[in-house]
Amino acid sequence: MKSLLGTKVGMTQVFTETGKAVAATVIYVEPNKVLAVKTNEKDGYNAIQIGYETVKEKALNKPLLGQFKKANSDPKRHIKEFRDVVAEVGAELTVSEFEPGQLVNAQAYTKGHGFTGSIKRHNFSMGPMGHGAGYPHRYVGSIAKGRGGSQAQRVFKGTKLPGHYGHELVTTKNLLVLDVKANENLILIKGAIPGPKGSIVLLKSAKKVGHIVSDPQVVNYLANKASSSEANK
């Protein structure tokens, strides 16, 4: 199992030999510094603790600074544990952990939309737009919680109402790695990844085994990338 923390740069396109445009998301991966190693004997599970995104010392409190000094590392903004990853303290995990043609899972928070109404949040229909409608056009309407009978005099949990929309942790699975630019710390992934530009993305090697890329043009693109990288070596 391979894992990395990265930053979403944005989206672009890569072109196959036949001119087909393939949408790709660009992820910048600053080297993930290993801060600590958890073992099954001492901690009950195997994992490594990494730090990501270098910050100034004044941005952190003293307990966190002591943790970084113990690991002989620069202060980092984000600390994350990766289960079942083998590495030593002080090592750096880079984009070279992944290679073109590999499948990965991307986990990130979706774009936040703040407090929104039920039409945008739950795709409700609008009310009549005629002048005689009288009723506000974007109201929720009745939620059928009146008196008597089977109608409870309360609002059940989960009722679709206005509220906070977006900023939810979402995992997109089995995304194809199109290219890895180790000298620029960039990785190109086929398709879209949740979140706005500048958001933190967790990349993990996909658990799905035996998946075959069905698009022959993308297969040829990856084959050409592999042959060119071997020639450069």
UniProtKB/Swiss-Prot annotation:
CC per GO annotation: cytosolic large ribosomal subunit
PROSITE patterns according to UniProt: RIBOSOMAL_L3
Source superkingdom: Bacteria
A single GO BP: translation
Pfam families recorded: Ribosomal_L3
One of the record's GO molecular function terms: structural constituent of ribosome
Keyword Signal: no
Record key words, sorted: Ribonucleoprotein, Ribosomal protein, RNA-binding, rRNA-binding
Alphabetized InterPro entries for the sequence: Ribosomal_uL3, Ribosomal_uL3_bac/org-type, Ribosomal_uL3_CS, Transl_B-barrel_sf
Family: Belongs to the universal ribosomal protein uL3 family.
Quaternary structure annotation from Swiss-Prot or TrEMBL: Part of the 50S ribosomal subunit. Forms a cluster with proteins L14 and L19.
Function: One of the primary rRNA binding proteins, it binds directly near the 3'-end of the 23S rRNA, where it nucleates assembly of the 50S subunit.
NCBIfam families: L3_bact
Protein known as: Large ribosomal subunit protein uL3
